[in-house]
Every structure is written in structure tokens, then in C-alpha cells.
């Protein structure tokens, strides 16, 4: 089918969601061999969608999530003064974690920075999380973060050793 019209009276938004959710779940169970990822559809508020995904219609298959890391720049063991000053003036700092990118060539990072500029941004700062004896950060701004601040950043963002963080 291409379209489904529902005639419902005296209902709330949740009633419509429940009916459509059950209809779609049962349809896919009956006619598809694929296993459903979930039987309850995730519900994301408009504000959360814009903050976490940068759009009001996110593709949840895309693992990139925008994280607010503003609080990191109030720490004494973070010395990235440009961002610290911005945060003091009320700005927010958000980042995206890219998984398993420690072995990517420099051109990978340069191309992402170029893309951000083409899209109207002023560029991206980034670093990759590594662990030799201790957790450290490699990249243009890596030296501004202590081991403890990186651990906190990893906790906030879900980043792991080998991931890169773009601000």
C-alpha cells in the first residue's frame, strides 16, 4: 500500500501513535523476514532532536550524535583558551564523536574540516583519543586536555580509545 487513511474520533496524539505503531510492527512481523530492532518506536522531542541530531527528522541509523561538552571548558586542567573564553561569555560547545578513526590519514580530518567550511562553519577543531601508558589526545588541539579531562569527556560523549572528537 502507498497510503493509509485512519478515521479516529475523540483521540489524543498518543492514541494515534499507538494504533500506527501496532499496525506497522505487526505488518513487518508478518511480511518481513528481518528482525525488528524495537517494537516500541523511540519518541524524541523536537528540541532533543535538534540538539542531538541537528535536524527535526533524524535518521537513527546514523550513529553520529551531537554532544554538549560546554562543562569541560570550565575545568582548570583544560587550557584551550579560545573555547574557555567563549564558554565564559555564554557560548555552548558541542562535539561529534567519530568511532575508530585513530588510523585515518590526515586528509580524512582535513576533508571534514573543509566540508564544515563549505557548509558555512568556520572550521572544526579535533583530536583523537589514544592510550599508551595513559589516556592522551593526538591532534591539533589534543595538547590542551589533561588525562582526567579526557576521561570526563569520554564519559560525557561515550567516546572510546581510538575515537576522534570534532568540536
Give names to the regions the model predicted.
Residues 1-167:
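Class II aminoacyl-tRNA synthetase catalytic cores and aaRS-like
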